[in-house]
Amino acid sequence: MATDQMDISGPPPKKQHVDTESQIPKMYEMIRDQMRTLASTHKIPLNIDHNCEVIGSIIMAACTNNRDLRPVDKYWFLMGPAGAEVMTEVEIDIQPQLQWAKGAVHDPKYKGQWYPFLALLQISNKTKDTILWQKYPVTQELEISNSLEIYANGHGIKDRLKNSRPRSVGPLVHLLHLKRLQENPPKNPKTKKPLESPAVNGIRKSIVGHLKRQCIGETQKAMINQFEMGRWESLSTFAASLLAIKPRIENHFVLTYPLIANCEDFAGATLSDEWVFKAMEKISNKKTLRVCGPDEKWISFMNQIYIHSVFQTTGEDLGVLEWVFGGRFCQRKEFGRYCKKSQTKVIGLFTFQYEYWSKPLKSAPRSIEGSKRGQISCRPSFKGKRPSYNNFTSIDALQSASGSQTVSFYDQVREECQKYMDLKVEGTTCFYRKGGHVEVEFPGSAHCNTYLFG
């Protein structure tokens, strides 16, 4: 099912502020309870992460009123004695979950608090496939360097959820939606007729507003004005500038389906502090959650994918992660092609440890070189301060690797980029020692400037 179709809903109407944060424990509990109820009804073990992912996806589909979801359907689960599990097709009746979602989620009284949470939950859970399959859908469609895909996070979630958390979605996603809007004006899904100009203008202004709130450079905002008018000559220059003049992306710490299903206590749950680290450590200490993959060689990397998914660290410096979590972090290129889901099997236990922690970065933190395919710039997820690295001296080389070029804004943005590149530190606050708020400085001796997709 496609999840990146054009959003034609227009800018959402202004509503009274809904305090989602205080409802996090309750929403986590409700998702977990629905997962456990559905699994127990069909005798599906939730101590296997593959099974949790399937069950969790079904609950998510019910919560978002997915049109492709059938009341009764067949799904594949790992079933059988420990150590001898086999993929088994099971018929699942989800009518009770559909009824629950209708009253608890879809009701207008609750929808406003649920959708921002569901958006973050979907971003977190879709990260695993993004890492394993390593595709570049947004940058390829925009015809810019694949190195910039780190600023297309969240592209795979439903548009109605993107609207609930627009600042948690990468700016290139908004840029792609704007380009599609101009090239293929949307139609009303009911009448099949093109939308009236006021509706299209409303959608365009909403997208442009999201972009301008995320991008902090004055020249970047000037280029966005050009895009709004349908002039895309400066696209590659704008995209390259994101690596130096880094945008605001609101990061949150969100548990994945296997962690939710295996968490016993959500008291005090938040999306932004040490509770998330502690919750993962408790699940790890139980030694009951089993991880799936191609074979045992993948176990450490599959456990690291949990970290990348929960903390949204796919663009973070691996040196920072090694210091925070106390162990070597792997690059995706160290492993071969991932197996088909039908060939996945239990390969080990979920393990998690940490030595330091930091809150998620929700503001702008503060590199560019040739036509490299891998990641060449850190997109910080943690607020803690750390050294800032530039793997480039100008934006010339990266811009030449993209499909479209311009000189209109080039000199302006180059000068502005240099000011940011000269900064030696990025991040806005400090790291903390495990178990409290004792401030700790990131060590300058740590091995940094390596990336998951490098």
Curated annotation (Swiss-Prot):
Cellular compartments per GO CC: helical viral capsid; host cell; host cell nucleus; ribonucleoprotein complex; viral nucleocapsid
> Does the UniProt entry include the keyword Ribosomal protein?
no
Where are the residues of the annotated region Disordered? Answer: 1-22
Task: State the disulfide connectivity.
Answer: none
| GO function term, MF aspect, one | RNA binding
Biological processes per GO annotation:
symbiont entry into host cell; viral penetration into host nucleus
Subcellular location(s) per record: Virion
> What domain of life does the UniProt record list for this protein's source?
Viruses
Q: Does the keyword RNA-binding apply?
A: yes
Keyword set, alphabetical order = Capsid protein, Helical capsid protein, Ribonucleoprotein, RNA-binding, Viral nucleoprotein, Viral penetration into host nucleus, Virion, Virus entry into host cell
Q: Please tell me where this protein is predominantly located.
A: virion
Q: In UniProt terms, what function does this protein have?
A: Encapsidates the negative strand viral RNA, protecting it from nucleases. The encapsidated genomic RNA is termed the ribonucleoprotein (RNP) and serves as template for transcription and replication.
What family does the Swiss-Prot or TrEMBL record give for this protein? Belongs to the influenza viruses nucleoprotein family.
Q: What is this protein called?
A: Nucleoprotein
Origin organism is Thogoto virus (isolate SiAr 126)
What does the record give as the organism's lineage?
Answer: Viruses, Riboviria, Orthornavirae, Negarnaviricota, Polyploviricotina
